[in-house]
């Protein structure tokens, strides 16, 4: 007779789960035995750490649209999952975690590795339940999946060690208290009220300078977004999680918005008279219009979040695609295209400026912007791009120009360090024939990326070419994003005790594991290094020794931030090098092209 552990995996299969990311431990011994008997249906993918398993489950959901799944043992293994699960929760991704627990008999005795898991997972999970009876497994699993899909969030199933080894009850006895659930779920067709649609159309039709801001919630509405932009003569800015919704070769797509955004996006938002947000919860008020400057229309599937980021005049709660399809017939084409032409001109000027900056190298060191700039025209069709959190994310956001069919993601809301590498691994497992390229800082690579190269070594037969699989490591021996934040936001000089990190031969480490390692420290060889990496049939660690003193300058510079940065520079340990390179000239060169917003209050 099958055990509860076998039934759990069978039910996961019925819900479409093909692989479960995790790390073994005695709290899930029953499940591990069931994985062995399941013979790869679903398969167990062993990561180096449970946090990486949760990141991979989140990435699977992001890149496939399916539920991601991870597992961990009781106690410490369960605790390790949390950061990756919060990444899924905050970026609205459906993930189911299956977690072990000590035997029911021992619970409440302060037993070894006993943790109150239902309390531990209560905040990160929309649904968290412990299975205490074999007949309960069916409906707990089913409800976990239905909840994860409906809420686009995390559900956690806790399975005590002894329950895993009991005989399964696929169909519990028909008696009072028994529950008989089913596998299945369908996405609802959500549309706003017709009156609100007409109100939204009136606002958009009246606007003379319409700016559109889209996020990942617009992912299935690309053609409708383009049609709306064409009718309204609008430009389209993208929140980072919405990078893949529209390709960057559309002339009126202004690129990312915010601290890592473009001048074109910032200028459009600053000067618009109507803001149209679609499928995004972009939170930063300093990058949105001033209150009262613009009329607002928003589409969001979650009514709890609509009108929260900017005061809206029309609130369209519904699916982005269906709502836009209902709205489009109500929109009138704007004959005056002056606003659109201005936006397209700003996009061209920003792209020219980025190209110019990427070509500036100092003292023979590689400008990190050039790493992204050289890759952009070389990007393979249909590739998947991931980024970690750090200064390299700036160059990933600004210099990589996505084309149709490409996918890209990062930890958008949690903005945690560490997901760039596991995201890429999950993407490769999901799409073994697609090129996958990760941008990772040396800090994040030391934090966990190096360990996950061992995961790649273990599954080399699955993850190797012919499609490129590349981990681009920015080696600047500095936790660079935080260093610049210390300077600009706190007015403090760089503190080497917290910011310096050891120099590690990342490319050589890759070779030690049987991967391909490529090292580049010369500006004129950046393009050649990319060509070599893209031609490899082995996973590649491509290490660039880059200049740590290239500032990730935002699209507009707050006066207060400029003052603090100047104050920090006086006592900065790198002040000699910064001065020698003419950092002031580099900053002023960019600043003269940027919009003002130089208010003391900012």
What do the predicted segments below correspond to?
Residues 160-162, 390, 547:
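Active-site beta-loop-alpha junctions enriched in small/polar residues
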Residues 98, 106-113, 307-309, 315-317, ...:
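Thiamine diphosphate
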Residues 33, 58, 119, 226, ...:
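Active-site phosphate/pyrophosphate- and oxyanion-stabilizing loops and adjacent acidic/basic residues
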Residues 5-8, 13-18, 26, 31-36, ...:
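Active-site diphosphate/adenylate-binding microenvironment
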Residues 23-26, 44-55, 70-76, 132-134, ...:
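Active-site nucleophile and cofactor-binding loops and adjacent substrate-binding regions
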Residues 1-338, 378-381, 435, 460-471, ...:
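N-terminal alpha/beta PP-like core and its mobile active-site loop of ThDP/TPP-dependent enzymes
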């Amino acid at each position: 007779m099958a055990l509860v552990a076998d039934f759990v995996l069978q039910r996961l299969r019925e819900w479409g789960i093909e692989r479960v990311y995790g790390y073994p431990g005695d709290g899930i011994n029953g499940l591990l035995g069931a994985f062995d008997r399941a013979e790869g249906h679903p398969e167990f993918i062993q990561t180096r750490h449970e946090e990486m398993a949760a990141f991979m489950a989140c990435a699977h959901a992001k890149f496939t649209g399916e539920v991601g799944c991870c597992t961990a043992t009781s106690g410490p293994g369960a605790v390790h999952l949390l950061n990756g699960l919060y990444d899924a929760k905050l970026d609205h991704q459906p993930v189911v975690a299956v977690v072990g627990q000590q035997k029911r008999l021992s619970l409440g005795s302060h037993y070894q590795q006993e943790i109150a898991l239902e309390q531990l997972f209560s905040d990160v999970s929309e649904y968290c339940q412990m299975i205490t009876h074999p007949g309960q497994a069916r409906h707990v699993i089913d409800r976990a999946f239905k909840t994860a899909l409906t809420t686009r969030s995390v559900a956690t199933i806790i399975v005590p060690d002894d329950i895993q080894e009991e005989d399964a009850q696929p169909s519990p006895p028909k008696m009072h208290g028994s529950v008989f659930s089913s596998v299945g779920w369908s996405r609802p067709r959500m549309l706003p009220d017709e009156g609100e649609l007409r109100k939204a159309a009136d606002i958009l039709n009246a606007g003379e300078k319409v700016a559109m801001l889209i996020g990942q919630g617009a992912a299935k509405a690309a053609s409708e977004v383009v049609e709306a932009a064409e009718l309204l003569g609008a430009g389209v800015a993208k929140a980072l999680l919405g990078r893949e919704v529209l390709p960057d070769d559309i002339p009126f797509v202004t690129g990312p918005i915010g601290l890592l955004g473009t001048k074109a996006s910032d200028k459009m938002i600053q000067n618009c008279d109507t803001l149209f947000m679609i499928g995004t919860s972009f939170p930063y008020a300093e990058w949105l219009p001033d209150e009262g400057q613009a009329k607002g229309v928003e589409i969001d599937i979650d009514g709890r979040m609509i009108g929260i980021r900017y005061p809206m005049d029309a609130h369209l709660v519904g699916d982005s695609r269906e709502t836009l399809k209902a709205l489009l017939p109500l929109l009138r084409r704007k004959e005056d295209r002056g606003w659109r032409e201005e936006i397209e001109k700003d996009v061209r000027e920003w792209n020219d400026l980025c190209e110019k900056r990427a070509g500036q190298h100092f003292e023979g060191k590689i400008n990190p912007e050039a790493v992204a700039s050289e890759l952009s025209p070389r990007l393979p069709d249909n590739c998947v791009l991931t980024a970690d959190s750090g200064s390299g994310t700036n160059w990933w956001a600004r210099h990589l120009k996505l084309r149709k069919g490409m996918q890209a993601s990062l930890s958008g809301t949690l903005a945690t360090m560490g997901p760039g590498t596991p995201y890429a691994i999950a993407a490769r497992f999901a799409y073994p024939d697609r090129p996958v390229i990760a941008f990772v800082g040396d800090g994040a690579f030391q934090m966990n990326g190096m360990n996950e190269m061992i995961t790649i070594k273990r599954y080399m037969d699955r993850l190797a070419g012919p499609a490129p699989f590349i981990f681009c490591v920015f080696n600047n021996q500095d936790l660079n994003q935080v260093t610049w934040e210390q300077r600009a936001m706190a007015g403090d000089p760089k503190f080497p005790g917290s910011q310096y990190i050891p120099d590690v031969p990342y490319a050589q480490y890759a070779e030690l594991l049987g991967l391909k390692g490529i090292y580049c420290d010369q500006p004129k060889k950046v393009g050649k290094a990319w060509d070599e990496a893209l031609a490899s049939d082995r996973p590649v660690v491509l290490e660039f020794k880059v200049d740590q003193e290239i500032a990730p300058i935002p699209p507009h510079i707050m006066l207060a931030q400029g003052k603090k940065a100047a104050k920090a520079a006086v006592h900065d340990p790198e002040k000699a090098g910064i001065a020698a390179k003419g950092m002031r000239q580099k900053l002023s060169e960019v600043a003269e092209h940027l919009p003002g917003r130089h208010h003391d209050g900012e």
